[in-house]
UniProtKB/Swiss-Prot annotation:
Residue numbers spanned by region Disordered: 1-24
Encoding gene, per UniProt annotation: RNASE1
Protein known as: Ribonuclease pancreatic
Functional summary from the UniProt entry: Endonuclease that catalyzes the cleavage of RNA on the 3' side of pyrimidine nucleotides. Acts on single-stranded and double-stranded RNA.
Tissue: Pancreas.
Presence of the UniProt keyword Cytoplasm in the record: no
Length: 124
């Protein structure tokens, strides 16, 4: 079974590129990372930084998560991210996404030993 940490890496990490390569980036990535298998995942964010830098956020600024939980952390620095959002005309199994690049602080929830990101909460 996929661990929460491995799921975070599959759904949110793309260290191989510094930004989205094209407007088709989200359509390709959402499919290749298995987020369009049983339904179209409506929203997802990819982080274009090293895994070590993203894992380090777990020891950075302690903040509340959107759901009120307290295990969230905000990155001290901005990170290169790509937001993927399902389009209005998207219909499973033909999931379609808009690709939006940004530089923002990320907020992640962390757990475990080693203490690593398991949930992408928000970007600010």
């Amino acid at each position: 079974k996929e661990t929460a940490a491995a799921k975070f890496e599959r759904q949110h990490m793309d260290s191989s590129t510094s930004s989205a390569s094209s407007s088709n980036y989200c359509n390709q990535m959402m499919k290749s990372r298995s987020m369009t298998q049983n339904r179209c995942k409506p929203v997802b964010t990819f982080v274009h930084z090293s895994l070590a830098b993203v894992q380090a956020v777990c020891s950075z600024k302690b903040v509340a998560c959107k759901b009120g939980z307290t295990b969230c952390y905000z990155s001290y620095s901005t990170m290169s991210i790509t937001b993927c959002r399902z389009t209005g005309s998207s219909k499973y199994p033909b999931c379609a996404y808009t690709t939006t690049z940004a530089k923002k602080h990320i907020i992640v929830a962390c757990z475990g030993b080693p203490y690593v990101p398991v949930h992408f909460b928000a970007s600010v």
